[in-house]
Every structure is written in structure tokens, then in C-alpha cells.
A protein has these predicted regions:
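Short, well-ordered coil/turn segments that N-cap beta-strands
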Residues: 11-16, 52-54, 81-85, 122-126, ...
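N-terminal binding-site loop/beta-alpha segment at the start of enzyme catalytic domains
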Residues: 1-85
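Aromatic-lined glycan-binding groove of carbohydrate-active enzymes
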Residues: 197-236, 269
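Glycine-rich beta-alpha junction loops
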Residues: 91-93, 164, 190-194, 216-223, ...
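Glycine/proline-rich, positively charged
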Residues: 27-28, 33, 94-196, 200
Length: 351
């Protein structure tokens, strides 16, 4: 296993993270994602941990809290030391019928963290992430609440998921100005079939030294190997009944046309190649794997040892490249003849 620091911190996390959206009791809005019970969850956690995975991601909303409860019980059942795992969960989504049982307000955050701690059977959360964009709550209120949780020791680090780049940048600025705990990570959708974050979010992450946790690295199973131009709705795939995340299907078929031969060349699944491509991206800290079966998890774990050569990476880059979009194409045009500092210094040294 390989490890990286989590954002601009000293905390080391595995480059593959076990996602637990599939841990379910058959309730809540995520029940269709998977039906992994306690016994099966224990085996998935054990397999991941024995492969070197120390990073586990969940959310309060997954199966109405059952995912958190199952993961916490797995740690107990397996006798894993709390210090040996990095536990990430999320807050924002609706957890009750009340008007304030949702969002990133101080009140909801304070209630939600205590509920998550109880379900997870722990006294602290390593990474507490705001799961979605709250259009009502002021950023300052959210950040102050999160900072208080860090001060209290209930949370070690904080992150955010599914926010726009400008709002993440604003939050970083507010934290710096007011001395509050800052977002160290962004959890975002990123895959060969969905590279949108490269436009604005990836440059922000690099500039601010933030970590990137990737969700849906296989585009909801589209890159798993089950789908192709000639088999667009396989019967055994969740995506056939739940078409998410949104992708340009024609671009996706073109990507799969390139992905599949590379997988055959290495005698591995297309899923493993798609994950290996993500792991080759410098901006990626950790890729979240979701699995319902041990064989799926083991296949995903194999991506850590798969080395794609430059020709293969270039082929995947080219077929999945984003279409030009303003202001990106204008920036590239206007800066085409602009020398960088190293070039200028080099010329000066030799003049």
C-alpha cells in the first residue's frame, strides 16, 4: 500500500480508501446502493485493512445511520486499534423530519456529530466533512462550529464535499483571517468519464495544498468492465437502474474503447486500469473504493500495484480530455508565448 499526507497535515492515509455506502440495513435514500450486512462488512473491512488500507469513509446519511453503525461495529468485532484507522464521516444531509434536521448550521452540526460518535462507537472523528453546499447558512457559522469541534477534541480535521471552487477558496480565506480550522480536504467526483474538477477545483487544491478524496472513481460502475457500446444496460449493474453520476455517454463509450484493450494487455479488469489512472494523478490523495463483495474489493486493491506506461496514460488522457471551455481556452491562448520564471532566469544566466 502507498500512503500520502492528508492535505497540509502530518496525518498519513492510504491511497485507497474503503467507502461504506454499501453498508446498509435496507433503509434510507442510499438503500439501493448495496445491502451489505454486518458479517459481510466485517470481511470487507478485514480484507481492506490487511491489504494496508487505514482510511475508511462513511456518512451519517448512508442508510439512515446504519453505515456508520456497521462500520463502528466492524472495528469492534475485528479488534482494530482506534489509532490504526483513520475514520472519515460527513454531516449535512437530512437525518430527521424537522426543519433544522439538515444543513451546515451550528445547531445541526453539533447534534449530528454527537449522533455520529455514538453510532461509530468512538470518542473522535479523524476527518469530519461537510457533505454538501448549504445555500442558507453563512460560511462563518459553519467554520466556527467545526473549529469548536476540533477544539473540543471530537474532530481532528475538517473537510468539504461537492462545493464550488470559489466557495472553497472563500472558506479557506475566512479560516485564515479568523484563525479557524480550515478545510484540509475536498471529496469530489473524479473519473476518466468525469474530469470536470480539473477546470477549477484541481488548481485550487494544488495552490492551497489541500487533499483530494475521489468518490465514484468508476463513474457509478460505468468503467467497471460490465458496460460497453454494445452492452449499455447490463442486468447485473446498479447503474442500469440508477443512472448516476451524470456522464456524456458517447464520450464514455469512446473511453471504454481505449480502456478495455489496455486492461486486456495487462490481464486485469478495466476497473483496475481506471483506478490506476486516477492514482497516477498528482492531485489525488486517496481513491474511495465501494464494494459489495470481496472479489470486487480485491480487484480494486490490485490497482495500487498496476503501473501504466506513458503511452497508455497518454492514450487515456487524450480520449478523456475535457472539451474546451471558457475561460480555459482563452487563458491558454493568451499565455502561449509567456515565459515562466525558470525560463527567464535560465536566459539571464546564459546572456
Amino acid at each position: 500500500m502507498q500512503y500520502r499526507t492528508l492535505g497540509h497535515t502530518g496525518l498519513l492515509v492510504s491511497r485507497l480508501c474503503l467507502g461504506t455506502m454499501t453498508f446498509s440495513n435496507g433503509e434510507g435514500v442510499y438503500q439501493h446502493i448495496g445491502n451489505v450486512g454486518q458479517k459481510e462488512a466485517d470481511e470487507l473491512v478485514r480484507t481492506a485493512f490487511e491489504a494496508g488500507v487505514n482510511f475508511f469513509d462513511t456518512a451519517d446519511v448512508y442508510s439512515a445511520g446504519a453505515s456508520e453503525a456497521t462500520l463502528g461495529q466492524s472495528f469492534r468485532n475485528l479488534g482494530l486499534a482506534r489509532s490504526d484507522v483513520v475514520l472519515a464521516t460527513k454531516v449535512y444531509s437530512r437525518m430527521g423530519p424537522g426543519r433544522n434536521d439538515v444543513g451546515a448550521s451550528r445547531g445541526h452540526i453539533m447534534d449530528a456529530v454527537d449522533a455520529s460518535l455514538r453510532r461509530l462507537q468512538t470518542d473522535h472523528i479523524d476527518l469530519y466533512q461537510v457533505h454538501a453546499n448549504d445555500t442558507i447558512t453563512p460560511i462563518d457559522e459553519t467554520l466556527r462550529a467545526l473549529d469548536d469541534l476540533v477544539t473540543q477534541g471530537k474532530v481532528r480535521y475538517v473537510g468539504v464535499s461537492n462545493w464550488q471552487a470559489w466557495k472553497i477558496a472563500r472558506a479557506i480565506g475566512v479560516s485564515a483571517e479568523k484563525g479557524l480550522a480550515r478545510f484540509e480536504t475536498v471529496q469530489a467526483y473524479y473519473s476518466l468519464a468525469g474530469r470536470d474538477l480539473e477546470r477549477e477545483i484541481a488548481p485550487l487544491l494544488e495552490a492551497e495544498k489541500m487533499g483530494l478524496m475521489v468518490w465514484s472513481p468508476l463513474a457509478g460502475g460505468l468503467l467497471s468492465g460490465k458496460f460497453s457500446r454494445d452492452n449499455q444496460k447490463p442486468a447485473d449493474s446498479r447503474r442500469s437502474g440508477f443512472d448516476f453520476p451524470i456522464v456524456d455517454k458517447e464520450r464514455a463509450w469512446n473511453i471504454i474503447d481505449v480502456l478495455a484493450p489496455i486492461a486486456r494487455r495487462h490481464q486485469v479488469s478495466p476497473a483496475r486500469v481506471a483506478l490506476a489512472w486516477l492514482l497516477s494523478r498528482e492531485v489525488v490523495t486517496s481513491v474511495i473504493m465501494g464494494a459489495r463483495r470481496i472479489d470486487q474489493l480485491q480487484d480494486n486493491l490490485g490497482a495500487i500495484d498496476l503501473q501504466l506506461d506513458q503511452e497508455e496514460l497518454q492514450a487515456l488522457d487524450e480520449v478523456s480530455v475535457l472539451p474546451p471551455e471558457y475561460p480555459g481556452w482563452m487563458l491558454a491562448t493568451q499565455s502561449a508565448d509567456r515565459l515562466g520564471p525558470v525560463d527567464l532566469w535560465g536566459e539571464a544566466l546564459h546572456s
